[in-house]
């Protein structure tokens, strides 16, 4: 006979197994499209723009395989972005510790080369990329497959006759970012989008930047009911952990990312493609 005590005991024993099974085998394979519609005043005069953001791919077998990256790329294309931003961390640190096996960066880049957008695919590097062969693996592979890598660079783009600037920073974790120097490359008053890997840079972003886009945090990667985020790799705790963040007149979007680091688990933060819509016809989310 199953008594209440036995039921609670068995449920207590089963819960960690169910949690572990879901966090290891189910949530990492999910894929969401998360929509944001910020309305920064600094975008006044800018075009209506659909931005797809892919962050923290961390390519590694058997979880983030080239075939899975291809699936992500095809799903992104189906969302019809005007521009695709890759927010860093294509390499997977877990492979150094015998967890999974490395995916050659040439295969990751080949899978990402499926991405299509009228205004191009633009990437910054993350701390895992710099920490593994100083980023040269990613630079070479992305160049070979036509993916534009930006390191303290500025690019003037135009849609529907309306210009804007895209800035891409070097990795801040390794001190390779030059925000003042990159901002100085902006040559006119067209609105500015800043792409960086780590969101900690946001404390230094000036008011005239319309939107900052980052990854790095994985949204905490594990968010427990009743507990919240376990850990965010940031000097500012949970301040820039995830989502659309508005401070004063400044807007930041932090992607929860796609892959995993440390352990091959996700819980409460499913992998996501972020879609950001900017423009005069947008109904703001904040």
Predicted regions and their residues:
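N-terminal secretory signal peptides and thylakoid transit peptides that target proteins
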Residues: 1-19
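Aromatic-capped interface at the extracytoplasmic side
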Residues: 20-35
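Extended active-site neighborhood of metal-dependent phosphoesterases/phosphodiesterases
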Residues: 34-39, 103, 107-178, 182-186
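Beta-strand-turn-beta hairpins that frame and shape the catalytic cleft
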Residues: 40-51, 155-166, 246-251
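Membrane-embedded segments
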Residues: 48-140
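Active-site neighborhood of phospho(di)ester-bond hydrolases with catalytic His/Asp-centered motifs
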Residues: 54-55, 84-89, 121-127, 150-152, ...
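Conserved beta-sheet core of the metallophosphoesterase superfamily
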Residues: 199-275, 282-283
């Amino acid at each position: 006979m199953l008594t209440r005590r036995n039921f609670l005991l068995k449920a207590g024993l089963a819960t960690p197994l169910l949690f572990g099974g879901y966090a290891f085998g189910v949530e990492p394979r999910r894929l969401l499209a998360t929509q944001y519609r910020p309305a920064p005043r600094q975008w006044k005069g800018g075009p209506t723009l659909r931005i797809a953001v892919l962050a923290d791919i961390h390519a590694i077998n058997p979880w983030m395989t080239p075939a899975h990256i291809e699936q992500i790329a095809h799903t992104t294309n189906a969302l019809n972005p005007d521009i695709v931003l890759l927010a860093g961390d294509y390499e997977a640190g877990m492979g150094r510790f015998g967890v999974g096996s490395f995916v050659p960066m040439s295969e990751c880049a080949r899978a990402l080369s499926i991405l299509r957008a009228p205004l191009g695919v633009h990437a910054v590097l993350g701390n895992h990329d710099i920490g593994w062969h100083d980023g040269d693996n990613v630079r070479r592979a992305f160049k070979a497959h036509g993916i534009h890598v930006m390191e303290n660079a500025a690019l003037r783009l135009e849609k529907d006759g309306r210009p804007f600037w895209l800035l891409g920073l070097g990795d801040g974790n390794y001190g390779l970012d030059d925000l003042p120097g990159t901002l100085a490359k902006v040559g006119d008053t067209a609105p500015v989008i800043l792409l960086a890997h780590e969101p900690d840079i946001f404390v230094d972003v000036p008011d005239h930047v319309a939107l900052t886009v980052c990854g790095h945090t994985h949204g905490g990667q594990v968010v427990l009911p009743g507990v919240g985020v376990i850990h965010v790799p940031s000097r500012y705790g949970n301040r820039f952990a995830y989502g659309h963040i508005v401070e004063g007149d400044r807007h930041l979007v932090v992607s929860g990312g796609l892959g995993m680091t440390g352990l091959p688990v996700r819980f409460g933060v499913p992998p996501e493609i972020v879609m950001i819509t900017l423009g005069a016809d947008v109904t703001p989310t904040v």
